[in-house]
Amino acid sequence: MLTDLRFALRQLAKTPGLTLVAIISLAVGVGSIVTVLCWTRHLVQRPLPGVADQQELVMLVSNQGGGNVSIPDLSDFVAQAGVFTGALVFMPTPASLEIERQAEWTNAQVISANAFELLGVKPILGRTFLPDEDRKPGGNPVVIISERLWRRRFASDPSVIGRVVDLNRHSFTVVGVAPETFVGTMAPTLTDVWAPASMIWEVRNQSTQFLTQRPWRGWLNLARLRPGVSLAEAQAAVETVNARLTQDHADTNRDVRHRVVSLAGCPWSAAAVLGPVLQLLLAVCGGVLLIVAANITSLLLARAIDRRKEIAIRLAAGANRVRILRQLLTESIVLSLVGGAAGVLLARWAVDALPLL
């Protein structure tokens, strides 16, 4: 076998142009399809980079308010369903961020004070929000910034904690820096600034009624299931609370129903946003790989035709047909392995080039 391998390498070296074209073609074909498969797997299994135990995260969706929920309703589900360890609410918004008189547009969120703890995200500098920082409307002008923003606008200065920035013309104090891996709760959209939910008026110019009123269903949310609780069990518990809320709050919840969806099934998740695009890319890459395979087959057939004289001489000299076929097969295997390995390296580079994965 080792002799066949050395012979295959010598034969491939005799036609460097054909060999190089075949390897590059295979690398592109294999690399593209492996890249898309890796992206798809990551989006389904880990749609929120930097978040711990994502398989336990779900979203409650209502049949009103565009699918969003109210804080009182969500609090009742957590307290009464018995299947959640906690939940958070958030609202995304584009915001004007001004640092040292230099303004830019950025993606911001108002979010529950318990969000970072619930998601298992620990700051690399400073702290997360305190439990009471989303209770008093407008009373806690503090923010946590992303590692990207910290690096880009503050040159990774560790003394950033305590600095004041202007968000939509309101002053906020930086109390923490999120880790690099955490991009927010709406990946693939990158969030750079988080403020407590109590600052909804200052950040989003929206009524503080969203903080306390049951009919004000404007919040996106994430809830964490207790270990071992399935999606079906959670939905059954939610149905029980649905009925209770309909009875106890008939004026606001008579026609309101909530259901549980998985993290990957959230309408704003990376899987939902990019899934159709990745499926299309996967089909395109599969077609490219088939074309590559057909082209390489044609090249190898042409090469075999050119070697007819050589093979005839070897047969006339008493060479074994099986041995010749084995050597030709070894050449094809070597070519495939080298091209495939190059494709895997190309795919690894492509996956690493996408920070969300």
PLM segments and residue spans:
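Alpha-helical transmembrane segments
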Residues: 28-56, 301, 350-357
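Small-residue-rich transmembrane alpha-helices
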Residues: 35-39, 259, 297, 332-357
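Mid-to-C-terminal secondary-structure elements
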Residues: 94, 108-131, 140-279, 352-357
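Short amphipathic beta-strand/extended segments in non-transmembrane regions
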Residues: 59, 72-130
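Intracellular coupling helices
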Residues: 9-17, 292-336
